[in-house]
């Protein structure tokens, strides 16, 4: 089953790839980037989470090492979107590899085939148990770097990745139905349960 571009990009650039308004004139300080990157996490996980920022080639630069197994991707400067996302370390190799292939302008169908082949061969290690993700995304103008707060124009998302899991096995639908969780990319390396997406709540 080939993945859809919307499904993949929903993870790789947050919940809303296209932001509105001007980009930042300069890159925020590392401490500000770290504070923003861990914001999607439950408060109990923030202090120990590692933070990396990816360059245009999809290569990571560590801003802070992880002390609890969680790794957050900082907002990438230079555009008008605020997007940060956090995953357990076991899922990060897949994130890095997908970002690298996308940065190289690999066609979507070839990317799927490449990831699938690398995962099946064992070259690319995937998690052996479900892993959670925490995301925040929206227009850059809706995030205040000075006090690390987001308005309700920023959307929060929680997902559970279950590589090769199927909707049937989990007893879930494959399309959104009211408030119920549902599965996207069922049966693929990218299979994930969409738990909830909602504007930031204060």
Residue ranges of predicted features:
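Bacterial N-terminal signal peptides that target proteins for export
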Residues: 1-11
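Bacterial N-terminal signal peptides
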Residues: 10-19
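Sec/Tat signal peptide C-region and signal peptidase I cleavage site
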Residues: 20-25
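Primary mode marks residue(s) on the alpha4-beta5-alpha5 output face of response regulator receiver
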Residues: 26-202
């Amino acid at each position: 089953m080939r993945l859809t571009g919307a499904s993949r990009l929903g993870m790789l650039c947050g919940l809303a790839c296209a932001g509105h308004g001007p980009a930042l004139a300069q890159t925020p300080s590392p401490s500000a980037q770290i504070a923003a990157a861990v914001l999607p996490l439950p408060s109990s996980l923030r202090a120990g989470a590692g933070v990396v920022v990816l360059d245009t080639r999809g290569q990571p630069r560590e801003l802070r090492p992880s002390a609890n197994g969680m790794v957050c991707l900082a907002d990438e400067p230079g555009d008008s979107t605020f997007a940060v996302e956090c995953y357990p370390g076991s899922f990060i190799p897949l994130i890095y590899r997908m970002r690298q292939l996308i940065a190289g302008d690999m066609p979507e169908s070839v990317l799927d085939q490449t990831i699938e082949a690398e995962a099946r061969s064992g070259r690319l290690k995937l998690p052996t148990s479900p892993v959670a993700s925490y995301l925040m995304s929206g227009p850059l103008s809706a995030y205040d770097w000075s006090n690390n707060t987001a308005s309700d124009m920023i959307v929060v998302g929680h997902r559970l990745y279950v590589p090769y899991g199927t909707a049937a096995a989990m007893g879930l639908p494959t399309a959104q139905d009211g408030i119920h969780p549902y599965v996207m990319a069922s049966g693929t390396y990218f299979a994930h349960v969409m738990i909830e997406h909602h504007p930031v709540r204060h």
